[in-house]
Structures are given as C-alpha cells and as structure tokens.
C-alpha cells in the first residue's frame, strides 16, 4: 500500500489516488503487554471489523495494566533507573516485529513518540519523574525510532495527553517534530492532546512539520459536547489541516472516574458528532481493557492516576 497524503483541499487523507478515511483502534499498551499470539488474534479480529489504523504508544503507557511480557525500553543503570543513552534493542526488536505483523495486514501504524509523562514541564511529568527523558537525549531517541519504524510508512503522533503548559514541553515537541520531518519527510505527523484542549501554541499552528490536527473529546460524562465543539474550534483555525478525533469516549470507560460507563451508543454519538462538525478526516475508537491491554487478575496501573486527576494532585 502507498503512503498517506493530505488532500488538495486539506481536509482529508488520500492514499493510492483514493480518499483514505482514518479508522483507528486504540491499543496504546501492546508493545509492553501483548503476547504475539494475542497480537495476531487481535489483528485478524480488527481487520475483520474494518479498522485500518492502530494507535500505539512507542514507550510504555503509564496507565497500562500489569503484564508478564513487560520489557524496559532503555538499558538499566546499576541503580535500576533507565539509562537514556542506551536504548534496549530487545524491546525495539519486539516492537518492530509487532508493527511488521500489523502492516502485513494493511494496518497503518500510528505511533506516539513522547507521551507527556516522559516530557519535562508537563502535568504528566509528576507521574513517573524518574522516567523523564532529558532534553539532550530527545534528538537521538527520536532519530532511532524514526529509523526503526519509518520504513513501515507510519503516522507519527509526536505527543500524548499534552497541554503545552511550559516552554520546556514545547521545546521537546518542536524538537521531535523537526527530527521526524528531517528523517522521514513523507510520514504524516500529528499531536495527541489532553482532553478538551484546542488552543495550540502558535508555533505549532504555523509549523510546516505538523500535518493534521488531532483532538481528544475525552471521557467526562458532563463534557461530551466537546466531540462537536472541538471539531468546530479546530475547523476555524487560520491554518487549515485535516482533523481527527483521536480519543472520543472509550467504550466501557468510566465517566471520568465517576460511577457509570460509556456504552456503544455513547461512542457512536461522539464519533458522528465529530465527523459532522468538521473532524471528517477520520476517527479513533477505544475499548476499555484493550487500550491498556488488561488480563483478568492483573493490576490496573491507572487506578492511581484516576484518583489523582479527580483530586487535582497532578494538575
């Protein structure tokens, strides 16, 4: 399959001369959690359902579930911390094999490079402070992952759950965008934002390295109008780009940490509201238990995060 491009009208994608609708499933945690048997079963099932893209976090998802398949992405220091100057080839061999299996089934890998907990100056940096990647290692890390995965024609999602609250964080993401476009100029780029966010720093709006907008309408029961409100906000920006709701409410996810869970009707409603309000380039779907790759009897590592978000401890 050919590379994905932006349409001349700059509001949808094109591949092999035909319109390409981005229909992604969210499986952030597969590189650390899934066995290869599970992964191949999943790929066949999602292909049968009609999905054509997969959203994956390159580094370990902080709120994944526990797994016996976990491998650290960096070599360890004598104290057990990550050595950011030494990437773990075993981890990336496994990750690349999983991407290869997905691409053989015609999936587009949408790979997140820097989730906010790995970036200094973000709200997420308080979650795993020992795993913040120093800025001096960002260029070499991004060069490595682009070299590893670029041949599979991925979409690179440069950020994860970010809200650009500091100049430090902005520097990380600008550096990552520049490296991606320098190393893989034909790969599309976007940014996964914190739920409800639509105000991007002007430097990103004007950047030639950002190819399309992605927003998150999120998992708050009281704020489900964000599915169409954010689409309209992005559609009104001065620089026109395709728009995707990359994280509508997940099926089975709690109502923002409150009692009750989103069902399939809620998900369909959020997606249709997004598409009909300007986010017409595509959408993602997420199922609770799949994005964090949960196995019965294992611990949910995100329980602590939900509690802290509700109390404001991390914000």
Residue ranges of model-derived segments:
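Active-site mouth of glycoside hydrolases
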Residues: 2-212, 216-224
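Short glycine/serine/threonine/alanine-rich loop segments
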Residues: 51, 107, 154, 241, ...
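Structured core elements
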Residues: 55, 72, 244-245, 283
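Generic recognition of flexible, low-complexity loop/linker segments
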Residues: 145, 201-202, 231-232, 270-271
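Solvent-exposed polar/charged
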Residues: 147, 182, 236-237, 276
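Active-site clefts of carbohydrate-active enzymes
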Residues: 162-163, 196, 210-218, 229-269, ...
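Aromatic- and carboxylate-lined catalytic core of secreted/periplasmic carbohydrate-active enzymes
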Residues: 251-253, 265-315
